[in-house]
Amino acid sequence: MADRVVLAYSGGLDTSVAISWIGKETGAEVVAVAIDLGQGGEDMEVVRQRAIDCGAVESVVVDARDEFADEYCLPTIAANALYMDRYPLVSAISRPLIVKHIVEAARSHGGTIVSHGCTGKGNDQVRFEVGFGALAPDLQVIAPVRDYAWTREKAIAFAEENNIPINVSKKSPFSIDQNVWGRAVETGFLEDLWNAPTKDVYDYTQDPTVNWNAPDELIISFDKGRPVAIDGRPVSVLEAIQELNKRAGAQGVGRLDVVEDRLVGIKSREIYEAPGAMVLITAHQELEHVTLERELGRYKRQMEQRWSELVYDGLWFSPLKDALDTFVNKTQERVTGDIRLFLHGGAITVNGRRSPESLYDFNLATYDEGDSFDQSASKGFVEIHGLSSKVAAKRDLGL
């Protein structure tokens, strides 16, 4: 009986060619698994059938949109996760979910080998293979695009020589990855850091000047860190992301032009569109400013960068990431309330906050009548707070 390879299938050129290549080079049967993460574009049934037409013995589509929103996007919101303080992990958080479903498919379809279509220069090869190792260390992994140094030209030539039914073009300038959390664009003329993105780079967002005279104001409600309503209308996490993608995207919000440090040691330029993600993280951060005690908030902000780095580096299933999740979940117990935001000209402006768990005390904060802050206590506090610095200064100055 032939081995079975379970392939993470995108429907694009590389993974379509991989189906035929794996069969020819290894004699194995290929089971193609496509994961719907809300990426839009082609109908998933078309993608499923394409895999069969390319030679897969079975082709499966998994609707993972709600799972992605609830179990991957929501923890990212809770962690205010922005890699290098900018990137909301658009692609990075999707890979562990894909890994999970590929492993499940391997178990249910008799697969002993798993495969992906990643190159050897990017982060995704690491995310996939480290994930496979964490969930199913017994499975073998093959990566034809990386291991045989496929170029787009080689893949197109193989497709033409083997009559693989996929429309391809050498003129497509960009590499694009997208899901409901956002969209990532790279390569082409963007590899020159001085080149400004052109209009055709963007899809999830409009030019920030298009709706200049029609700004949008909205209220996002959270319950223990989870977005539960927009303008008073109950929403699921998926619905919140989808609605904010449309509304914030219409205002040009969520465009990011980033030079980032890849795990493999190189710097790369990426253009991201993440309107819903950026609005939700901004609103969530602001609610935490209102509801988290100072020392807890300070420590959480330090931890957030490490959480982001772990996820970016493909360590979603690591013991440290698991431990940090426990900490983050604890911090969310009182992150309940409403944040009002103004979206305009590509910018997000918070202009209102309210929470039953607020630590903001008006009587302590006000400078007007009703001030309950005992200013007489401040003199001694300042003296004690600066005492160690004062002692050191006297020593250094010889006083």
Swiss-Prot record:
Binding positions for L-aspartate per the UniProt entry: 119, 123-124
Q: Which SUPFAM superfamilies match?
A: Adenine nucleotide alpha hydrolases-like (SSF52402), Argininosuccinate synthetase, C-terminal domain (SSF69864)
Q: Which reaction does it catalyse?
A: L-citrulline + L-aspartate + ATP = 2-(N(omega)-L-arginino)succinate + AMP + diphosphate + H(+)
- Pathway(s) annotated for this protein in UniProt: Amino-acid biosynthesis; L-arginine biosynthesis; L-arginine from L-ornithine and carbamoyl phosphate: step 2/3
Output the PROSITE patterns linked to this UniProt entry: ARGININOSUCCIN_SYN_1 (PS00564), ARGININOSUCCIN_SYN_2 (PS00565)
What the entry lists under Gene3D superfamilies is as follows: Argininosuccinate synthetase, chain A, domain 2, HUPs, Single helix bin
Give each disulfide bond as a residue pair: none
Q: Which amino acid positions bind ATP, per UniProt?
A: 8-16, 117
User: Taxonomically, which superkingdom?
Assistant: Bacteria
- Which biological process terms from the Gene Ontology are attached to this UniProt entry? argininosuccinate metabolic process; L-arginine biosynthetic process; urea cycle
- Provide this UniProt record's keywords sorted from A to Z: Amino-acid biosynthesis, Arginine biosynthesis, ATP-binding, Cytoplasm, Ligase, Nucleotide-binding
| Single GO MF descriptor | ATP binding
| EC number, as in UniProt | 6.3.4.5
* GO CC annotations on file: cytoplasm
Binding-site residues for L-citrulline, renumbered to this chain: 87, 123, 127, 175, 260, 272
What does the UniProt entry say about where the protein is found? Cytoplasm
Q: How does it assemble?
A: Homotetramer.
Name the family: Belongs to the argininosuccinate synthase family. Type 1 subfamily.
What protein am I looking at?
Argininosuccinate synthase
Q: Which organism is it from?
A: Rhodococcus erythropolis (strain PR4 / NBRC 100887)
